[in-house]
Every structure is written in C-alpha cells, then in structure tokens.
Amino acid sequence: MNALVRRCVARTGIPSIWRRKCFSSGNEPAESNHVTPMLRHLMYKIKSTGPITVAEYMKEVLTNPAKGYYVHHDMLGEKGDFITSPEISQIFGELLGVWFVSEWMASGKSTAFQLVELGPGRGTLTADILRVFSQLGSVLKTCDISIHLVEVSQKLSEIQALTLTEETVPLERDAESLVYMKGVTKSGIPISWYRDLKDVPTGYSFYLAHEFFDVLPVHKFQKTPHGWREVFVDIDPQSPDKLRFVLAPCATPAEAFIQRDERREHVEVCPDAGVVIQELSQRIASTGGAALIADYGHDGTKTDTLRGFYEHQLHDVLTAPGTADLTADVDFSYLRRMAQGRVASLGPVEQRTFLKNMGIDVRLKVLLDKAGDPSLQQQLLRGYDMLMNPQKMGERFHFFALLPHQRLHVGSQGGKACQSEAPSTSVPGFDELVWH
C-alpha cells in the first residue's frame, strides 16, 4: 500500500467547501495549540511512507499501544469525552439482560451459554445485565453462565475488573496468553478477558456490541468526475504542524469495498466491521445464540459521519490527535450484507422503539414507586428522557440483531445478503416483549 500511496496520492487538497462541510467542527481542546505526541508520531509516519488512509489514521489515533486515545484516556462518564446509555440509566442494561434471558428461553433453554461483550467500556452494562441474571436466578438455575469480554485497552480492562469481579478472589493475569485476565464476578460467575473475538471459545453464546462498531476504522471515498477516489490524511504544506485531507488521484485497493450501484457522493466503509460480522455470523450459525448490536448509525443512507468528541463537544477530527475520541456512524446495510445470509437479521430499529417494546415504561414506574427520594426520582426521569427523547438518544441510536434462521422459522434464502423476512415468531425489542 505504501508504494501505491507514493505513486498515487497528490498533495492537492480537497475542495475547501467540501472540507468545511464535512470535517471542521470549530471546537478545539485547549491542547490543540500544541503538537501532541500522537501528532508527532503521525507526521513522522507520513513523512516516511506518504499520506495515510483515514482508516489507518483512526486506528493509530485510537489504539496505538504507545500513544493511542483508548490507551491513555478515561473517556467515559461526565469527566470523559462522552457518556453512553449504561452510564445514564440502569434501566438500559436491565432491559438488555431481559432480552438475553428471553432469547435463551425462546431458543430452547440451553444448559449453558456464554455472554460475550465487545468493547465493554467501564463494565457498567455487563454489571446491570448480571444483576438481572441474579434476579432471575430461579429461571436460570439449571444454566451454566460464563462472561467473556473482548477489550484491547489494558486501562479499561482494569476498570472493568473493579466494576465486575469479587475482590476476595485474586485475578489471574497472563499478558502473553490469549486469555490475558481471569476472575470471578461478584455473583460468582467466571469471567475472562481477550484482545480479539477470535480468541473467545466457540459455543452457544450471546454477543453484545454496544457502541463498539462506531469506533472501528473507516475508509472514506469521494465521487469525482474521474470515478471514486479515496480520502487520505496528509501534512498541510501551508501549516507544517497541521494535518489535512487529500484525495488520491487514482484508484486504491480499498475501492473494492464500494457497491457497484452506489448512488451517494461520499461513502464510508468499515472492513473491520465486516470481519467481525462474518465471525459472529459463522459462530451463531454453527453453535447457536444471538448477537445484539446497539449503535448510532443508518441503513445505507448517510454520507460523511466521521467526527471527534472532546469533553462532550464536537471536535475537529484532525486537530490534536490522540486527545479526542473519533467515531463514525454504523452502516447497518453493510453489516447485513456481510452476514452473507448465514443468519437472519432484524433491524435496525430506533432505540426508543426497542426500549418501549422491552417494557421501559413499566420498569420506570416500578423504580419511581420504589424511590422515595424526589432527587432520585428526578434522576430516573432525566435518564429516561435521555434514552427515549427523539432529539437525544431516542432516534439517533439503533438496535440490530443477528439470529439463527431457525429462531425465526425462516430459510436461508439461498444465501442472499438481504434483510430477513418478517419472522413468524416475535423477537423482543423488535416486537413487544411477551413473557411465556
């Protein structure tokens, strides 16, 4: 790729009107006036090998083991750069816990299952789900459950361990092993940490990916009079301590990811997401279970969605790299195609629809009745509003599921990569929850 970059990538910038519209937020952190360690690293890399793809830029900025954002920042919560749904209200995680138990029951009550979370954050979501498992202990008493967390950040894995594990049981650590940490949850369930989904044991499993896919690196493409051209990141010759976007003057290998009938003028493609979906689909088709994906995204309609967040504010993605989170909306139509017909897919449906179908209003009323403190009641109501309000998270976030075809009594459709037919049996969240 480097040789191709050297031959192909022009030093001519993207038209300024397009750049302003797509990439500049006008919000910069206080550190933006300084050259960050990540910026120095990127400039050295670009000077050595030429401009880099947006996907490579995102990967370096977020996960570089020495200078990456996820390695050195506590990005979650009020003091971080963004707040996720589990940090807002316990109800969110509780309803997801109910979803997994409901699916376990609907698929035959296996004697064992794994709960696998991709990118668990602080561990808050898993903790809320485990609380539901404990509350439904009489239902799950014959089932052996284990927890498996896929986490690349050592710092976050330590936070997750503090949230989830029993302090009296020492953690087993082995940095060289595929399972780099093991322990026992506060409710007595075995828990393990991995760096890659492929390292998680196969078997009947429920997979959870909440705000996981949106941080995977995307390739960006712009339609030009000469065809599709990939967007690269280069050093700005007018400001040597700044970066800018440029277009490749000829085709690059990643162009193969674009659909032949694509009608949008600007496209983002996430090959890493496709790899994860293919792995999930293969596992679910072979050993059963389901995958529940919650993220902000679209169904193949949006164009440029790459953005940065610094202290809960939009932030220019090229300014002070390494100090802000980078994210791009998930293209659920792409995820559906990557399942390649191995499994059935449902959604995406808006978060407010999913949570309403799962009974969030009933759960809120129960908690409000139990909360005698008016301040606690207000906190519950504020959390509900954040999750359900169309202007907040209600319509921005979506739920998407992968399930075995037999769960819906739907055939494989000859391997066609399209959305599954309407299920003959209801699936909670995508339909109204009904306990049997």
From Swiss-Prot:
Enzyme class: transferase
Disulfide links within the chain: none
InterPro entries listed in its UniProt record: NDUFAF7 (IPR003788), NDUFAF7_sf (IPR038375), SAM-dependent_MTases_sf (IPR029063)
GO cellular component, one term: mitochondrion
Assembly: Interacts with NDUFS2.
Location, primary (coarse class): mitochondrion
Enzyme Commission code: 2.1.1.320
Transit peptide range per the UniProt entry: 1-41
Role played: Arginine methyltransferase involved in the assembly or stability of mitochondrial NADH:ubiquinone oxidoreductase complex (complex I). Acts by mediating symmetric dimethylation of 'Arg-118' of NDUFS2 after it assembles into the complex I, stabilizing the early intermediate complex.
GO terms for biological process, alphabetical: mitochondrial respiratory chain complex I assembly; peptidyl-arginine methylation, to symmetrical-dimethyl arginine
Alphabetical UniProt keywords: Methyltransferase, Mitochondrion, Transferase, Transit peptide
Stretch list, region Disordered: 413-436
Full protein name: Protein arginine methyltransferase NDUFAF7, mitochondrial
Protein source organism: Rattus norvegicus (Rat)
Lineage, top ranks: Eukaryota, Metazoa, Chordata, Craniata, Vertebrata
Cellular localization per UniProt: Mitochondrion
Top-rank taxon: Eukaryota
Family: Belongs to the NDUFAF7 family.
Any Pfam family matching the protein: Methyltransf_28
GO MF: enzyme binding; protein-arginine omega-N symmetric methyltransferase activity
Record's catalysed reaction(s): L-arginyl-[protein] + 2 S-adenosyl-L-methionine = N(omega),N(omega)'-dimethyl-L-arginyl-[protein] + 2 S-adenosyl-L-homocysteine + 2 H(+)
